[in-house]
């Protein structure tokens, strides 16, 4: 009887784990915006400061294409 209960417990934990992973995969409602896309370059300090103050988000400088100047990309909760 103890083996059956242990097996049921393991299956239950597996099901709960799968559902929690599926909920995380759906997304947490995060949005992305390019801050000042016409700027000639991305100053990481100014980029992060603008993102935090305007959107309460996280920012990084990312180039959209190889050879193009990086843009300030801000990710925040929608």
Curated annotation (Swiss-Prot):
GO cellular component, one term: extracellular region
Main location group: secreted
Record bears the keyword Oxidoreductase: no
Places the protein is found: Secreted
Keywords of this entry: Antimicrobial, Disulfide bond, Fungicide, Plant defense, Secreted, Signal
Disulfide bonds: 31-78, 42-61, 47-72, 51-74
GO BP annotations listed: defense response to fungus; killing of cells of another organism
Signal peptide: 1-20
Pfam families: SLR1-BP (PF07333)
InterPro entries tied to this protein: DEFL
Similarity comment: Belongs to the DEFL family.
PANTHER family per the UniProt record, alphabetical: DEFENSIN-LIKE PROTEIN 155-RELATED, DEFENSIN-LIKE PROTEIN 184-RELATED
Record-given protein name: Putative defensin-like protein 154
GN (gene name): LCR35
């Amino acid at each position: 009887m103890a083996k059956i209960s242990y097996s049921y417990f393991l299956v239950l934990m597996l099901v709960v784990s799968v559902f929690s992973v599926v909920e995380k995969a759906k997304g947490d409602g995060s949005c992305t915006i390019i801050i000042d896309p016409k700027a000639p370059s991305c100053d990481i300090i100014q980029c992060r400061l603008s993102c935090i103050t305007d959107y309460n988000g996280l920012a990084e400088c990312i180039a959209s294409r190889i050879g193009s100047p990086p843009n300030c990309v801000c990710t925040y909760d929608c």
